Amino acid sequence: MTDYARYIDHTLLAANATEQQIVTLCDEAIAHHFYAVCVNSGYVPLVAEKLKGSAVQVCSVIGFPLGAGLTSSKAFEAKAAIDAGAQEIDMVINVGWLKSGKIDAVKADIQAVRGVCAAIPLKVILETCLLDDEQIVLVCEMCRQLDVAFVKTSTGFSTDGAREEHVRLMRSTVGSEMGVKASGAVRDRETAQRMIEAGATRIGTSSGVAIVSDDAAAAGNY
């Protein structure tokens, strides 16, 4: 039987997320033994304090949700998040640069963040709903070359979330050594299982409790 809890990055990234909601997120993650709690960098100090002494990892998004900021800003934010207690980093690529053919700039953007979190896992968010298959493969290959830990489908803030076919393509491109994180619109156990079967090794969701309990009514009201 699948141990769904160990796949889950329990996530709350909404602009209007309150401190109490973040505390609840952490309490749920500890109670259900989720892999990580994923939040915006401003909440990393709170999450690090709440999770202290537990096995749950602190994950921060960077350049979220657009990925369109300066590379130097992303690197600075990543370092600040790590200094505040982040143990994993999820960064968004610059999709506009990719679609403009600025491949070297996209690579340098990832490399800059990779440089400041060399000691911890980096997950690179592609925003697959905005890319064609060729672009997905290109970024996955780039991440493999840069020794990135995970490629990740989506922010959950664009036109679509994780799709099985994209997870499958990402897995086939990066091979068995790298992680693949499916995020966005994974709200129940059935969807999570499909993503895992397609090759996902981590699930980003605010519905972790619903997934592990197989009870849609238990989804977080985030």
UniProtKB/Swiss-Prot annotation:
GO terms for biological process: 2-deoxyribose 1-phosphate catabolic process; carbohydrate catabolic process; deoxyribonucleotide catabolic process. The keyword rRNA processing does not apply. Pathway: Carbohydrate degradation; 2-deoxy-D-ribose 1-phosphate degradation; D-glyceraldehyde 3-phosphate and acetaldehyde from 2-deoxy-alpha-D-ribose 1-phosphate: step 2/2. The active site is at residues 90, 152, 181. It holds the Pfam family DeoC. Its main location: cytoplasm. GO terms for cellular component: cytoplasm. InterPro entries: Aldolase_TIM, DeoC, DeoC/FbaB/LacD_aldolase, DeoC_typeI. It catalyses: 2-deoxy-D-ribose 5-phosphate = D-glyceraldehyde 3-phosphate + acetaldehyde. Its EC number is 4.1.2.4. One of its GO terms (molecular function) is deoxyribose-phosphate aldolase activity. Keywords: Cytoplasm, Lyase, Schiff base. PANTHER family: DEOXYRIBOSE-PHOSPHATE ALDOLASE (PTHR10889:SF1). Belongs to the DeoC/FbaB aldolase family. DeoC type 1 subfamily. NCBIfam families: deoC. Catalyzes a reversible aldol reaction between acetaldehyde and D-glyceraldehyde 3-phosphate to generate 2-deoxy-D-ribose 5-phosphate. This is Deoxyribose-phosphate aldolase. It comes from Pectobacterium atrosepticum (strain SCRI 1043 / ATCC BAA-672) (Erwinia carotovora subsp. atroseptica). The gene is deoC.
